[in-house]
């Protein structure tokens, strides 16, 4: 148990330990604003005419620790009302009128030196004037070291030179190739200084056979690896004038050159033209040996190998299917023979030995029939994921629904002997069909008075087992429990106990005594006695109409007695599970606008709203 706990905690900590050095942070961070302030101040100081630009908002930011802290920024600016010659800073300026103001977007890399000093390494701004084409302004700090992308095209000549330098100045038996560039920095001097950190991997090309890397040289997964840190200076003529390299090699697994196996089977593509002759001989052999009346045809080739053994030996696995061409009317199998979708299917293993110089072919084929699956017929519209229980009763077949949380097991009724009491009940129904549990149907009289045999509660007459849904004799004497919220001359019981013991036990039953014509009711779709419901005539509507009661019974406390009470603490694991996905957080970028534009609140975006019109909803 302790080991499982440790592994679980480690799996949660590993993602945090393997995070990259570059990470996104909040655009409203104080240090981010200071970095943007340094970048925008630097841009304004480079311009000698026109107005200063004012920050609108920061759109993207990422921090890199390598080992100094660098901020990669993207922010939007708007032209202000302060001239460049004024002694004001951009923070003291307001936005110029939008119709006449220029806008722009800048991308910058800013280094943080110490705790408070920010210096701009590189910056590019795209300015869109109120009238005229877009103007691009670039700035690169002379002498400032700043990180660059590991996929920068400027690194390609440096890396190419570095790999060649390593292969020429090491005593390793094989050539190495670039594996991954991990980190790169650039500095503008009288030329450019580069510092690159990358990994290398051993290839399959030995120095005895190859003097330099070629496209045939591939990195070995089990070969030696290394990690290098290089420093290079590229002059203004784009030549590498100085270079230094430091590499650490790590031995891999024992490298063994692949052995060439003469005579071993080699896999070949299943659609290779070399298989055509072998397949033709295989299917001809199959049709000659099979005693069926129809020809077989190759449907699918699963796999194939070829082996050089005094010739060529083909081993083929394929699926053959019976065609519509009979052997009696066709001398041989032709391409026009179509596959019989209801015919026999064979799984075949063929070995074809071809001796080209003798022009002889020796095929052998072994086939096994594949089993055929027959589908069972279901009632129309009936899903295989639904189950219906069919119960035999006297003279009829009843379809019952699966039990739900509101229906007890049917055996409760049969096992309950308390419902055999000698209590007589009288029911009164003044020409109305009241939708209560246990309303029975019988001979309709003016006042509908009578007695009946009951095993459920309610006003019903006849032999009934549930809700009084059935036809029977209106006049009769029987024993059973009665419940009537109106007039009841029988004994009064608590309504909870008989309801739970008898409600929802059987789906529907039909009396086997009398079939008399009754008034038209909503229950005319009930199953008639002596008529069995067969599956071809069975419909979903029949199932629903037969078993759904008119009204649902009231919910009781005892209905949920089968659900156990689980005691949990509010702060327990049952309430606070560890999610497999990161929690969603509010977006960190873009930042809030620096100040309002034309009187608009910078923290609230105003949207035009219209009153709701009913016509819009109807369109």
Swiss-Prot record:
The modification 4-hydroxyproline is found at residue 380. Gene3D superfamilies: 3.10.450.10. One of its GO terms (molecular function) is cysteine-type endopeptidase inhibitor activity. It is found in: Secreted, Extracellular space. (1) Kininogens are inhibitors of thiol proteases; (2) HMW-kininogen plays an important role in blood coagulation by helping to position optimally prekallikrein and factor XI next to factor XII; (3) HMW-kininogen inhibits the thrombin- and plasmin-induced aggregation of thrombocytes; (4) the active peptide bradykinin that is released from HMW-kininogen shows a variety of physiological effects: (4A) influence in smooth muscle contraction, (4B) induction of hypotension, (4C) natriuresis and diuresis, (4D) decrease in blood glucose level, (4E) it is a mediator of inflammation and causes (4E1) increase in vascular permeability, (4E2) stimulation of nociceptors (4E3) release of other mediators of inflammation (e.g. Keywords: Blood coagulation, Disulfide bond, Glycoprotein, Hemostasis, Hydroxylation, Inflammatory response, Protease inhibitor, Pyrrolidone carboxylic acid, Repeat, Secreted, Signal, Thiol protease inhibitor, Vasoactive, Vasodilator. This is Kininogen-2. One of its GO terms (biological process) is blood coagulation. The gene is KNG2. InterPro entries: Cystatin_dom, Cystatin_sf, Kininogen, Kininogen-type_cystatin_dom, Kininogen_Fetuin_HRG, Prot_inh_cystat_CS. It comes from the Eukaryota. Residues 394-495 are annotated as: Disordered. The keyword Secreted applies. Residues 27-131, 150-253, 270-373 form the Cystatin kininogen-type domain.
């Amino acid at each position: 148990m302790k080991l499982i706990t440790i592994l679980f905690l480690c799996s949660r900590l590993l993602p945090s330990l393997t995070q990259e050095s570059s990470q996104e942070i909040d655009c409203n961070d104080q240090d981010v604003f200071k970095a943007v302030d340094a970048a925008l101040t630097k841009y304004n100081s480079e311009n000698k005419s026109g107005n200063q630009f004012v920050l609108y908002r920061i759109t993207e930011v990422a921090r890199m620790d390598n080992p100094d802290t660098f901020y990669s920024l993207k922010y939007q600016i708007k032209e202000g009302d302060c001239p460049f010659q004024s002694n004001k800073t951009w923070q003291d300026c307001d936005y110029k009128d939008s119709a006449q103001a220029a806008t722009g977007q800048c991308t910058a890399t800013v280094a943080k030196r110490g705790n408070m000093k920010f210096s701009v390494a590189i910056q590019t701004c795209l300015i869109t004037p109120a009238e005229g084409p877009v103007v691009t302004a670039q700035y690169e700090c002379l002498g400032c070291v700043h990180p660059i992308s590991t996929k920068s095209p400027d690194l390609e000549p440096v890396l190419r030179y570095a790999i060649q330098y390593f292969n020429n100045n090491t005593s390793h038996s094989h050539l190495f190739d670039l594996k991954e560039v991990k980190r790169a920095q650039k500095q503008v001097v009288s030329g450019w200084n580069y510092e690159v950190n990358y990994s290398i991997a051993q290839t399959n090309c030995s120095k005895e056979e190859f003097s330099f890397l070629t496209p045939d040289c591939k990195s070995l997964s089990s070969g030696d690896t290394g990690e290098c840190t290089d420093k290079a200076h590229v002059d203004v003529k784009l030549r590498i004038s100085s270079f230094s390299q430091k590499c650490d090699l790590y031995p891999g697994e024992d490298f063994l050159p692949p052995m060439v196996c003469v005579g071993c089977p080699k896999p070949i593509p299943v659609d290779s033209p070399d298989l055509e002759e072998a397949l033709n001989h295989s299917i001809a052999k199959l049709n000659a040996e099979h005693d069926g009346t129809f020809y077989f045809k190759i449907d699918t080739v699963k796999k194939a190998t070829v082996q050089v053994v005094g010739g060529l030996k083909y081993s083929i696995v394929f699926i053959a299917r019976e065609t519509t061409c009979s052997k009696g009317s066709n001398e041989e199998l032709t391409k026009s023979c179509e596959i019989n979708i209801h015919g026999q299917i064979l799984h075949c293993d063929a070995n074809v030995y071809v001796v080209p110089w003798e022009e002889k072919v020796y095929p052998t084929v072994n086939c096994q029939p594949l089993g055929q699956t027959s589908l069972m017929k279901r009632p129309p519209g009936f899903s295989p994921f639904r189950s219906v229980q069919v119960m035999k009763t006297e003279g009829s077949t009843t379809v019952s629904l699966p039990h739900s949380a509101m229906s007890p097991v049917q055996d409760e009724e049969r096992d309950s002997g308390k419902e055999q009491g000698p209590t007589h009940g009288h029911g009164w129904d003044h020409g109305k069909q009241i939708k209560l549990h246990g309303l029975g149907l019988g001979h309709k009289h003016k006042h509908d008075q009578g007695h009946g045999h009951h095993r459920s509660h309610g006003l019903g007459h006849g032999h009934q087992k549930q809700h009084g849904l059935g036809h029977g004799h209106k006049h009769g004497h029987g024993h059973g429990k009665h419940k009537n919220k109106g007039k009841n001359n029988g004994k009064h019981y608590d309504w909870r106990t008989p309801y739970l013991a008898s409600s929802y036990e059987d789906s529907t039953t039909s009396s086997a005594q009398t079939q008399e014509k009754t008034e038209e009711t909503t229950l005319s779709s009930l199953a008639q006695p002596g008529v069995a419901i067969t599956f071809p005539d069975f419909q979903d509507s029949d199932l629903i109409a037969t078993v759904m009661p008119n009204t649902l019974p009231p919910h009781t406390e005892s209905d949920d007695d089968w659900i156990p009470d689980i005691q949990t603490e509010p702060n327990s694991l049952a309430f606070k599970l560890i999610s497999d996905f990161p929690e969603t957080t509010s977006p960190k970028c873009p930042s809030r606008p620096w100040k309002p534009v034309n009187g608009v609140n910078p923290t609230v975006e105003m949207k035009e709203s219209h009153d709701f019109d009913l016509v819009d909803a109807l369109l």
